[in-house]
A protein has these predicted regions:
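Glycine-rich phosphate-binding loop plus the immediately following alpha-helix
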Residues: 20, 27-34, 45-63, 135-136, ...
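Conserved active-site and cofactor/substrate-binding residues in soluble primary-metabolism enzymes
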Residues: 10, 24-27, 56, 74, ...
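Catalytic phosphate/nucleotide-handling subdomain of diverse soluble enzymes
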Residues: 6, 11, 20, 25-26, ...
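Generic structural signal for well-ordered alpha-helical scaffold segments
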Residues: 84-95, 164-169, 271, 290-301
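Short beta-strand-loop/turn "lid" adjacent to the catalytic site in phosphate-handling enzymes
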Residues: 65-128
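Nucleotide/phosphate-binding catalytic cleft detector across ATP-hydrolyzing
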Residues: 1-10, 96, 111-131, 141-143, ...
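A contiguous, well-structured pocket-lining segment that forms one wall/lid of small-molecule binding clefts
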Residues: 218-309, 319-324
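Conserved beta-strand elements of the Class I
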Residues: 14-16, 174-178, 311
Length: 324
C-alpha cells in the first residue's frame, strides 16, 4: 500500500497500458507519461506498438468461446506470458527499464461477455493472467477492469468513457468518440462528466472479418480498405432482416460481444448469402455496421445532444467503404 501511495503522490507517472480487443488480431501496447491526477490529468504518449497474434494463437483464442474449462485455464496463463513479453518488447524498443515503470494496466483478452441476457447475470471473462505479467516484469499490474465495472453497477463495456472525458473534453463542444473495433462503441463527451454516456452500438468489424475468414479459409483476415465491399451491392432484404436484431432496440447503457455478433451470426449470414455474390454479402454486412451506428445516433444520442464533432478510431477507420 505504501508503494501505491508513493505512486499516487508523484507529480508524474510512467505507465504502460495493454489492450487485446474483440477483433482478436493482436495486442496494442502504449507507454505513457501521466501528469497530474483525476480530471486534471494530462497524458503524453512515449511509445506505441501493436504485436499481432500468430494465426495459430488467434484460432486458439477464438475456439475458447466453446472450449473446455481446462483449455481456458491453460490459455489464461499462455496469454499472460504473451502480454508480459509484449510489455518487455515495447520497453526495450522505447529504451526504458521495467524499474522505471510505475504500473502496468492490462485489459487482457475477452473470452465471454454477458450483458442484458434474459435470466442471466451480467458477467464477463478476460484471460491473460495479471500475476504472470507482474512476475515477469516486476511491475505493479492492474487488471480486471471489466469485472470491476460490472461490480460497480455497469455492464462491463465500454471501458473508455472516463479516459475519453479526460483526453477529449473541450469547453463549449459536444464530441462523439466512435470506436470501430470488433464491436463498435461510442462515447459522448459533453461539458460535464456526469453527462457522459457510452454504449456499444453493435457490430464493428467482427461480422466482416468472420465472413472474409470463411471465404478465404483463413488466408485473409479482413476486407482490406473495404475493397471487397466497394465492388458489391447492398441486398436490401437481408439488410432489413439484420436491422431487426433485438440488440439494436435495447436502450443504453448496453454492451455486447462475440457471443451475439460472432460465429453464430456469421454462419447464419453465410448460409443466407448462399448463391449471392460474395462482394454483395460483404457490402451488406458493411452497411449493417454503418446502419447500426447511424440508428444509435438517431435514437439514443441526437434527442439529447447536439454533437459538434465526431472522432473515429479502431481498425474500421481504415475501411473506406464503411467510412463513406
Amino acid at each position: 500500500m505504501k508503494r501505491l501511495q508513493r505512486i499516487w503522490q508523484k507529480k508524474s507517472r510512467i505507465a504502460l497500458g495493454m489492450m487485446a480487443g474483440t477483433s482478436t488480431d493482436g495486442v496494442d501496447v502504449a507507454l505513457t507519461r501521466i501528469s497530474g491526477r483525476g480530471l486534471a490529468s494530462s497524458v503524453h504518449l512515449l511509445s506505441f506498438a501493436t504485436y499481432p497474434f500468430s494465426a495459430q494463437m488467434r484460432n486458439r483464442i477464438l475456439q475458447l468461446l466453446s472450449a473446455r474449462t481446462e483449455e481456458i485455464c491453460e490459455m489464461n496463463f499462455i496469454v499472460g506470458e504473451i502480454l508480459a513479453d509484449c510489455a518487455l518488447k515495447l520497453l526495450a524498443h522505447a529504451g526504458y527499464k521495467p524499474e522505471q515503470i510505475d504500473f502496468i494496466g492490462s485489459h487482457g483478452q475477452t473470452i465471454y461477455h454477458l450483458s442484458g441476457a434474459a435470466g442471466r447475470r451480467n458477467s464477463t471473462l478476460q484471460i491473460g493472467e495479471g500475476a504472470i505479467i507482474a512476475a515477469r516484469t516486476g511491475v505493479i499490474t492492474v487488471c480486471d477492469f471489466r469485472p470491476a465495472d460490472i461490480a460497480a453497477g455497469g455492464t462491463g463495456a465500454p471501458l473508455v468513457p472516463y479516459a475519453d472525458f479526460v483526453l477529449f473534453r473541450k469547453k463549449g463542444k459536444v464530441r462523439a468518440l466512435l470506436n470501430l473495433g470488433g464491436i463498435a462503441n461510442v462515447t459522448i463527451v459533453p461539458g460535464r462528466l456526469e453527462e457522459v454516456i457510452a454504449f456499444d452500438t453493435g457490430p464493428g468489424n467482427m461480422v466482416l472479418d468472420g465472413l472474409v475468414a470463411l471465404k478465404f479459409q483463413g488466408r485473409k483476415r479482413c476486407d482490406v480498405d473495404g475493397q471487397i465491399a466497394a465492388r458489391g451491392k447492398v441486398d436490401k432484404n437481408l439488410l432489413r432482416d439484420l436491422m431487426r436484431h433485438p440488440y439494436l432496440k435495447r436502450q443504453p447503457p448496453k454492451s455486447t460481444g462475440r457471443e451475439t455478433f460472432g460465429e453464430g451470426l456469421v454462419k447464419s449470414l453465410w448460409e443466407q448469402g448462399n448463391g449471392m455474390p460474395f462482394a454483395d454479402l460483404i457490402t451488406t454486412a458493411t452497411y449493417f455496421t454503418a446502419a447500426a451506428v447511424h440508428r444509435s445516433f438517431l435514437k439514443f444520442i441526437f434527442p439529447s445532444f447536439k454533437v459538434d464533432e465526431i472522432f473515429v478510431s479502431g481498425g474500421g477507420r481504415h475501411n473506406r467503404t464503411l467510412m463513406a
